[in-house]
A protein has these predicted regions:
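Surface-exposed acidic/polar loop and edge beta-strand patches at domain peripheries
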Residues: 1-127
Length: 127
């Protein structure tokens, strides 16, 4: 088994980028950008399995805005809704709240036998 590691000391387009990797895979997460997984790379093939929007660079969104105007690619958390909706008098944005909010994070285990990154966010609208 190859060594695993977490490197929290990267920045990409002025966003913190936390890189998790082992001998086979590399993932890049933006905690400030809804814990977006921006890269998921098979290292042997140098193949990123996540699409990047050629027209939009990663940037901090404004809460409640249209997801499509901010989507730079990658893999986003879209809890708790898929469309704009109202529940118990509260209006939820398109594709939810979590994609546009900064998440707290900590490295639980930095490697080399195991690497574990813990990310957490409380919603603003949803109970």
């Amino acid at each position: 088994m190859s060594a695993a590691r977490i490197d929290p000391n990267w920045r990409y387009h002025d966003l913190r980028a936390v890189v998790l990797e082992n001998g086979r895979l590399r993932a890049t997460v933006f905690p400030e950008l809804g814990a977006k997984i921006y890269d998921f790379v098979l290292k042997a093939a140098d193949r990123n399995f996540l699409w990047h929007n050629p027209r939009l660079e990663p940037r901090l969104p404004v809460f409640g805005q249209n997801f499509d105007d901010w989507w730079c690619g990658g893999w986003d958390e879209v809890f708790p809704t898929c469309d704009v909706s109202t529940y118990r008098g509260d209006t939820y944005p398109y594709l939810g709240e979590l994609w546009s909010l900064p998440w707290s994070w900590r490295v639980e285990e930095p490697g080399p036998s195991r690497a574990c990154l813990y990310l957490e966010r409380t919603t603003v609208i949803a109970p």
